[in-house]
Amino acid sequence: MSSNRKDDHVRHAVDQHRDRTPVNDFDAIGFQHHALAGIDAADVDLGVDIAGKRWHTPLFINAMTGGSAAATDINRGLAIAARETGLPVASGSLSAYFRDPGLAGSFRVLREENPHGVVIANVNATATLDQARRAVDLLAADALQIHLNAVQEIVMPEGDRSFRSWPRRIEHLAAGVPVPVIVKEVGFGLSRPTVAWLRDAGVAVADVGGRGGTNFARIENDRRPAADFSFLDTWGQSTPACLLDSAEVTGIALVASGGIRSPLDVAKALALGADATGVAGRFLATLLDRGAEGLIETIRAWLDQLRSIATVLGAATPADLRRCDLLITGEVAAFCRLRGIDAAAYAHRSHWWHPSERRSLL
Protein backbone atom coordinates (compact mmCIF):
# COMPACT_ATOMS: atom_id res chain seq x y z
CA MET A 1 0.00 0.00 0.00
CA SER A 2 1.47 3.36 -1.01
CA SER A 3 2.15 6.08 1.54
CA ASN A 4 -0.37 8.29 -0.27
CA ARG A 5 -3.05 5.62 0.11
CA LYS A 6 -2.14 5.19 3.78
CA ASP A 7 -2.63 8.91 4.30
CA ASP A 8 -5.91 8.81 2.34
CA HIS A 9 -7.15 6.10 4.70
CA VAL A 10 -6.32 8.23 7.72
CA ARG A 11 -8.09 11.27 6.27
CA HIS A 12 -11.23 9.36 5.34
CA ALA A 13 -11.31 7.46 8.65
CA VAL A 14 -11.06 10.67 10.65
CA ASP A 15 -13.79 12.27 8.54
CA GLN A 16 -16.10 9.40 9.51
CA HIS A 17 -15.55 9.98 13.24
CA ARG A 18 -14.99 13.70 13.67
CA ASP A 19 -17.74 15.85 15.14
CA ARG A 20 -20.43 13.19 15.20
CA THR A 21 -21.67 10.31 17.29
CA PRO A 22 -23.19 7.87 14.80
CA VAL A 23 -26.04 5.60 15.72
CA ASN A 24 -25.08 1.92 15.79
CA ASP A 25 -26.22 -1.36 17.32
CA PHE A 26 -24.75 -0.57 20.73
CA ASP A 27 -27.80 1.69 21.06
CA ALA A 28 -29.95 -1.47 21.01
CA ILE A 29 -28.19 -2.76 24.14
CA GLY A 30 -29.10 -1.38 27.57
CA PHE A 31 -28.33 -2.24 31.18
CA GLN A 32 -31.21 -3.02 33.54
CA HIS A 33 -30.60 -0.66 36.46
CA HIS A 34 -30.68 -2.13 39.98
CA ALA A 35 -30.51 0.72 42.48
CA LEU A 36 -28.88 -1.37 45.26
CA ALA A 37 -26.39 -3.29 43.11
CA GLY A 38 -23.52 -0.83 43.51
CA ILE A 39 -20.16 -1.56 45.12
CA ASP A 40 -17.22 0.62 46.19
CA ALA A 41 -15.12 2.11 43.39
CA ALA A 42 -11.99 1.01 45.26
CA ASP A 43 -13.08 -2.60 44.77
CA VAL A 44 -13.06 -2.36 40.95
CA ASP A 45 -10.05 -3.87 39.16
CA LEU A 46 -10.08 -3.21 35.40
CA GLY A 47 -7.19 -5.59 34.65
CA VAL A 48 -7.65 -8.49 32.22
CA ASP A 49 -5.54 -11.40 30.99
CA ILE A 50 -5.26 -11.42 27.19
CA ALA A 51 -2.89 -13.30 24.88
CA GLY A 52 -0.59 -14.36 27.67
CA LYS A 53 -0.26 -10.87 29.14
CA ARG A 54 -1.85 -8.99 32.02
CA TRP A 55 -3.39 -5.81 30.60
CA HIS A 56 -4.04 -3.02 33.10
CA THR A 57 -7.28 -2.21 31.31
CA PRO A 58 -9.77 -3.94 28.99
CA LEU A 59 -9.31 -1.07 26.52
CA PHE A 60 -6.60 -0.83 23.85
CA ILE A 61 -5.63 1.32 20.88
CA ASN A 62 -6.39 -0.74 17.78
CA ALA A 63 -4.55 -0.92 14.46
CA MET A 64 -4.42 2.29 12.42
CA THR A 65 -1.51 3.28 10.21
CA GLY A 66 2.19 3.32 9.33
CA GLY A 67 4.45 3.67 6.31
CA SER A 68 4.53 7.43 5.71
CA ALA A 69 5.93 10.57 7.32
CA ALA A 70 2.49 11.55 8.58
CA ALA A 71 1.96 8.03 9.91
CA THR A 72 5.21 8.27 11.88
CA ASP A 73 3.90 11.31 13.74
CA ILE A 74 0.57 9.59 14.36
CA ASN A 75 2.21 6.43 15.69
CA ARG A 76 4.48 8.49 17.93
CA GLY A 77 1.44 10.19 19.45
CA LEU A 78 -0.39 6.89 19.89
CA ALA A 79 2.65 5.31 21.53
CA ILE A 80 3.05 8.20 23.95
CA ALA A 81 -0.64 8.00 24.86
CA ALA A 82 -0.36 4.23 25.35
CA ARG A 83 2.72 4.65 27.53
CA GLU A 84 1.12 7.27 29.75
CA THR A 85 -2.20 5.46 30.19
CA GLY A 86 -1.10 1.81 30.25
CA LEU A 87 -3.13 0.86 27.18
CA PRO A 88 -1.83 -1.76 24.75
CA VAL A 89 -1.40 -0.46 21.20
CA ALA A 90 -1.51 -2.21 17.81
CA SER A 91 0.38 -1.06 14.74
CA GLY A 92 -1.14 -0.50 11.34
CA SER A 93 -0.47 -3.10 8.66
CA LEU A 94 3.26 -3.64 8.14
CA SER A 95 2.80 -4.43 4.43
CA ALA A 96 4.49 -1.16 3.47
CA TYR A 97 7.53 -2.12 5.56
CA PHE A 98 7.80 -5.49 3.82
CA ARG A 99 7.95 -3.72 0.45
CA ASP A 100 10.29 -0.97 1.65
CA PRO A 101 12.34 -1.69 4.80
CA GLY A 102 13.27 1.99 4.83
CA LEU A 103 9.82 2.64 6.30
CA ALA A 104 10.63 0.67 9.45
CA GLY A 105 10.91 3.80 11.56
CA SER A 106 7.26 4.75 11.08
CA PHE A 107 6.31 1.51 12.85
CA ARG A 108 9.25 1.07 15.21
CA VAL A 109 8.39 4.37 16.92
CA LEU A 110 5.53 2.49 18.63
CA ARG A 111 8.09 0.52 20.62
CA GLU A 112 10.69 3.26 20.94
CA GLU A 113 8.22 5.60 22.65
CA ASN A 114 6.61 2.79 24.64
CA PRO A 115 9.47 0.46 25.63
CA HIS A 116 7.69 -1.36 28.46
CA GLY A 117 4.11 -1.45 27.17
CA VAL A 118 2.14 -4.07 25.27
CA VAL A 119 2.69 -3.58 21.52
CA ILE A 120 0.95 -5.67 18.85
CA ALA A 121 2.26 -6.06 15.29
CA ASN A 122 -0.29 -6.13 12.45
CA VAL A 123 -0.03 -8.02 9.14
CA ASN A 124 -2.48 -9.11 6.48
CA ALA A 125 -3.58 -12.69 5.85
CA THR A 126 -1.21 -13.08 2.89
CA ALA A 127 1.92 -12.41 4.96
CA THR A 128 4.56 -15.12 4.84
CA LEU A 129 5.90 -16.69 8.00
CA ASP A 130 9.19 -14.85 7.46
CA GLN A 131 7.36 -11.53 7.16
CA ALA A 132 5.30 -12.23 10.27
CA ARG A 133 8.44 -13.00 12.26
CA ARG A 134 10.10 -9.83 10.95
CA ALA A 135 7.05 -7.83 12.05
CA VAL A 136 7.24 -9.28 15.55
CA ASP A 137 10.98 -8.65 15.73
CA LEU A 138 10.71 -5.05 14.46
CA LEU A 139 8.34 -4.04 17.25
CA ALA A 140 9.51 -6.53 19.87
CA ALA A 141 5.81 -7.32 19.73
CA ASP A 142 3.86 -9.10 22.43
CA ALA A 143 1.34 -10.50 19.93
CA LEU A 144 0.76 -10.73 16.18
CA GLN A 145 -2.50 -9.36 14.80
CA ILE A 146 -3.69 -10.67 11.41
CA HIS A 147 -6.36 -8.53 9.78
CA LEU A 148 -9.09 -9.89 7.50
CA ASN A 149 -10.32 -7.37 4.95
CA ALA A 150 -11.79 -9.25 1.99
CA VAL A 151 -14.66 -6.77 1.56
CA GLN A 152 -12.25 -3.83 1.57
CA GLU A 153 -10.06 -5.60 -0.98
CA ILE A 154 -12.85 -6.16 -3.49
CA VAL A 155 -13.82 -2.48 -3.39
CA MET A 156 -10.18 -1.42 -4.02
CA PRO A 157 -9.53 -1.27 -7.77
CA GLU A 158 -6.00 -2.53 -7.06
CA GLY A 159 -7.09 -4.88 -4.26
CA ASP A 160 -6.62 -8.60 -3.84
CA ARG A 161 -9.11 -10.96 -5.50
CA SER A 162 -7.76 -14.23 -4.15
CA PHE A 163 -8.88 -15.35 -0.68
CA ARG A 164 -8.96 -19.15 -0.85
CA SER A 165 -5.53 -19.50 0.76
CA TRP A 166 -6.28 -17.35 3.79
CA PRO A 167 -7.33 -20.17 6.19
CA ARG A 168 -4.23 -22.22 5.39
CA ARG A 169 -2.00 -19.17 5.79
CA ILE A 170 -3.52 -18.29 9.16
CA GLU A 171 -2.90 -21.81 10.46
CA HIS A 172 0.70 -21.59 9.25
CA LEU A 173 1.29 -18.25 10.95
CA ALA A 174 -0.38 -19.30 14.20
CA ALA A 175 1.88 -22.34 14.40
CA GLY A 176 5.05 -20.55 13.38
CA VAL A 177 5.34 -17.24 15.23
CA PRO A 178 6.74 -17.05 18.77
CA VAL A 179 3.89 -14.91 20.16
CA PRO A 180 0.11 -15.35 20.50
CA VAL A 181 -1.93 -14.61 17.37
CA ILE A 182 -4.93 -12.30 17.21
CA VAL A 183 -7.17 -12.37 14.14
CA LYS A 184 -9.36 -9.34 13.52
CA GLU A 185 -11.94 -8.29 11.01
CA VAL A 186 -11.64 -4.68 9.86
CA GLY A 187 -15.31 -3.75 10.25
CA PHE A 188 -17.57 -6.44 8.81
CA GLY A 189 -17.67 -8.90 11.69
CA LEU A 190 -16.66 -12.45 12.59
CA SER A 191 -19.38 -15.11 12.67
CA ARG A 192 -19.72 -17.95 15.16
CA PRO A 193 -18.33 -20.60 12.75
CA THR A 194 -15.41 -18.32 11.88
CA VAL A 195 -14.49 -17.79 15.53
CA ALA A 196 -14.72 -21.52 16.21
CA TRP A 197 -12.50 -22.23 13.21
CA LEU A 198 -9.93 -19.69 14.40
CA ARG A 199 -9.82 -21.37 17.80
CA ASP A 200 -9.22 -24.76 16.20
CA ALA A 201 -6.47 -23.23 14.03
CA GLY A 202 -4.50 -22.20 17.11
CA VAL A 203 -5.48 -18.53 17.21
CA ALA A 204 -5.47 -17.11 20.75
CA VAL A 205 -7.78 -14.11 20.29
CA ALA A 206 -10.59 -13.27 17.86
CA ASP A 207 -11.29 -9.55 17.41
CA VAL A 208 -14.81 -9.55 15.99
CA GLY A 209 -14.28 -6.14 14.33
CA GLY A 210 -17.94 -5.56 13.58
CA ARG A 211 -19.87 -2.99 11.58
CA GLY A 212 -20.53 0.34 13.27
CA GLY A 213 -17.15 2.06 13.35
CA THR A 214 -14.70 2.97 10.59
CA ASN A 215 -16.13 1.69 7.30
CA PHE A 216 -13.29 0.63 5.00
CA ALA A 217 -15.62 -0.28 2.16
CA ARG A 218 -16.83 3.32 2.18
CA ILE A 219 -13.25 4.62 2.41
CA GLU A 220 -12.19 2.62 -0.64
CA ASN A 221 -15.36 3.52 -2.51
CA ASP A 222 -14.65 7.22 -1.94
CA ARG A 223 -11.32 6.69 -3.69
CA ARG A 224 -12.85 5.01 -6.76
CA PRO A 225 -13.31 7.05 -9.94
CA ALA A 226 -16.13 4.77 -11.14
CA ALA A 227 -18.03 1.51 -10.45
CA ASP A 228 -19.73 2.66 -7.27
CA PHE A 229 -19.82 0.13 -4.41
CA SER A 230 -21.92 2.21 -2.01
CA PHE A 231 -24.41 -0.66 -1.74
CA LEU A 232 -21.84 -2.33 0.55
CA ASP A 233 -22.04 0.47 3.12
CA THR A 234 -24.17 -1.72 5.40
CA TRP A 235 -22.43 -5.03 4.68
CA GLY A 236 -21.60 -7.29 7.60
CA GLN A 237 -22.72 -7.77 11.18
CA SER A 238 -22.40 -5.28 14.01
CA THR A 239 -20.07 -5.76 16.94
CA PRO A 240 -22.89 -6.53 19.43
CA ALA A 241 -24.36 -9.06 17.00
CA CYS A 242 -20.99 -10.76 16.57
CA LEU A 243 -20.42 -10.99 20.32
CA LEU A 244 -23.83 -12.54 20.84
CA ASP A 245 -23.27 -14.94 17.96
CA SER A 246 -19.96 -16.18 19.38
CA ALA A 247 -20.86 -16.15 23.07
CA GLU A 248 -20.86 -19.94 23.36
CA VAL A 249 -17.55 -20.49 21.56
CA THR A 250 -15.06 -21.47 24.25
CA GLY A 251 -11.29 -21.78 24.19
CA ILE A 252 -10.57 -18.45 22.52
CA ALA A 253 -10.60 -14.89 23.88
CA LEU A 254 -12.96 -12.38 22.27
CA VAL A 255 -12.10 -8.76 21.58
CA ALA A 256 -14.73 -6.21 20.57
CA SER A 257 -13.87 -3.46 18.14
CA GLY A 258 -15.94 -1.55 15.62
CA GLY A 259 -18.25 1.19 16.81
CA ILE A 260 -16.94 1.70 20.35
CA ARG A 261 -17.89 5.35 20.90
CA SER A 262 -17.82 5.77 24.67
CA PRO A 263 -17.00 4.08 28.00
CA LEU A 264 -20.62 2.91 28.09
CA ASP A 265 -20.08 1.04 24.81
CA VAL A 266 -16.97 -0.52 26.38
CA ALA A 267 -19.06 -1.73 29.33
CA LYS A 268 -21.76 -3.07 26.99
CA ALA A 269 -19.20 -4.98 24.93
CA LEU A 270 -17.69 -6.53 28.05
CA ALA A 271 -21.17 -7.44 29.29
CA LEU A 272 -21.84 -9.14 25.95
CA GLY A 273 -18.83 -11.39 26.45
CA ALA A 274 -15.80 -9.49 25.18
CA ASP A 275 -12.58 -9.93 27.12
CA ALA A 276 -11.29 -6.56 25.90
CA THR A 277 -12.27 -3.72 23.57
CA GLY A 278 -10.35 -1.88 20.87
CA VAL A 279 -10.79 1.69 19.66
CA ALA A 280 -9.16 3.11 16.53
CA GLY A 281 -10.95 5.83 14.59
CA ARG A 282 -12.30 7.78 17.54
CA PHE A 283 -8.90 7.91 19.24
CA LEU A 284 -7.25 8.83 15.94
CA ALA A 285 -9.59 11.79 15.50
CA THR A 286 -8.85 12.92 19.06
CA LEU A 287 -5.10 12.67 18.48
CA LEU A 288 -5.23 14.74 15.29
CA ASP A 289 -7.54 17.35 16.81
CA ARG A 290 -5.97 17.67 20.27
CA GLY A 291 -2.55 16.04 20.13
CA ALA A 292 -1.09 13.34 22.36
CA GLU A 293 -1.95 15.24 25.55
CA GLY A 294 -5.56 15.51 24.44
CA LEU A 295 -5.71 11.78 23.73
CA ILE A 296 -4.13 10.98 27.10
CA GLU A 297 -6.75 13.14 28.81
CA THR A 298 -9.53 11.42 26.87
CA ILE A 299 -8.30 7.90 27.65
CA ARG A 300 -7.90 8.68 31.34
CA ALA A 301 -11.44 10.05 31.39
CA TRP A 302 -12.73 6.90 29.66
CA LEU A 303 -11.03 4.65 32.21
CA ASP A 304 -12.37 6.67 35.13
CA GLN A 305 -15.87 6.62 33.63
CA LEU A 306 -15.66 2.89 32.92
CA ARG A 307 -14.73 2.30 36.55
CA SER A 308 -17.72 4.41 37.61
CA ILE A 309 -20.09 2.41 35.38
CA ALA A 310 -18.74 -0.86 36.79
CA THR A 311 -19.18 0.50 40.32
CA VAL A 312 -22.85 1.30 39.79
CA LEU A 313 -23.46 -2.07 38.14
CA GLY A 314 -21.74 -3.99 40.96
CA ALA A 315 -19.00 -5.37 38.72
CA ALA A 316 -15.66 -5.68 40.51
CA THR A 317 -13.95 -6.97 37.36
CA PRO A 318 -14.64 -6.74 33.62
CA ALA A 319 -15.74 -10.39 33.69
CA ASP A 320 -18.36 -9.54 36.33
CA LEU A 321 -20.15 -7.39 33.76
CA ARG A 322 -21.24 -10.63 32.08
CA ARG A 323 -23.54 -11.23 35.04
CA CYS A 324 -25.33 -7.90 34.63
CA ASP A 325 -28.82 -7.84 33.15
CA LEU A 326 -28.93 -6.61 29.56
CA LEU A 327 -31.95 -5.45 27.59
CA ILE A 328 -31.48 -6.35 23.92
CA THR A 329 -33.88 -4.63 21.52
CA GLY A 330 -34.33 -3.57 17.91
CA GLU A 331 -32.33 -5.09 15.08
CA VAL A 332 -30.01 -6.88 17.49
CA ALA A 333 -32.98 -8.70 19.04
CA ALA A 334 -34.15 -9.60 15.53
CA PHE A 335 -30.67 -10.93 14.73
CA CYS A 336 -30.81 -13.07 17.88
CA ARG A 337 -34.12 -14.60 16.84
CA LEU A 338 -32.77 -15.52 13.42
CA ARG A 339 -29.57 -17.01 14.86
CA GLY A 340 -31.31 -18.97 17.61
CA ILE A 341 -29.94 -16.85 20.46
CA ASP A 342 -32.07 -16.39 23.60
CA ALA A 343 -31.90 -12.61 23.98
CA ALA A 344 -34.38 -12.66 26.87
CA ALA A 345 -31.98 -14.73 28.97
CA TYR A 346 -29.56 -11.80 29.02
CA ALA A 347 -32.17 -9.77 30.91
CA HIS A 348 -32.23 -12.26 33.81
CA ARG A 349 -28.56 -12.95 34.62
CA SER A 350 -27.84 -10.99 37.78
CA HIS A 351 -28.17 -12.25 41.35
CA TRP A 352 -26.89 -9.20 43.18
CA TRP A 353 -29.66 -9.47 45.78
CA HIS A 354 -28.69 -12.99 46.85
CA PRO A 355 -26.70 -13.07 50.14
CA SER A 356 -23.95 -15.21 48.59
CA GLU A 357 -23.39 -12.54 45.94
CA ARG A 358 -23.00 -9.61 48.35
CA ARG A 359 -19.98 -8.69 50.42
CA SER A 360 -20.53 -8.08 54.10
CA LEU A 361 -21.15 -4.43 54.93
CA LEU A 362 -19.29 -4.81 58.21
From Swiss-Prot:
Residues holding substrate: R5, K6, Q152
Paired cysteines (S-S): none
Binding locations of FMN: A63, M64, T65, S93, N122, K184, T214, G259, I260, R261, A280, G281
UniProt subcellular location: Cytoplasm
GO biological process per UniProt: isoprenoid biosynthetic process
Binding locations of Mg(2+): E153
InterPro entries: Aldolase_TIM, FMN-dep_DH, IPdP_isomerase
UniProt keyword annotation of Flavoprotein present: yes
Keyword annotations from UniProtKB, A to Z: Cytoplasm, Flavoprotein, FMN, Isomerase, Isoprene biosynthesis, Magnesium, Metal-binding, NADP
Entry-linked Pfam families: FMN_dh
Cofactor: FMN; NADPH; Mg(2+)
Its EC number(s): 5.3.3.2
A GO molecular-function annotation: NADPH binding
The organism's place on the tree of life at top rank: Bacteria
Principal subcellular localisation of the protein: cytoplasm
Database matches in CDD domains: IDI-2_FMN
Subunit structure: Homooctamer. Dimer of tetramers.
Task of the protein: Involved in the biosynthesis of isoprenoids. Catalyzes the 1,3-allylic rearrangement of the homoallylic substrate isopentenyl (IPP) to its allylic isomer, dimethylallyl diphosphate (DMAPP).
Protein family (similarity comment): Belongs to the IPP isomerase type 2 family.
Name listed for the protein in its UniProt record: Isopentenyl-diphosphate delta-isomerase
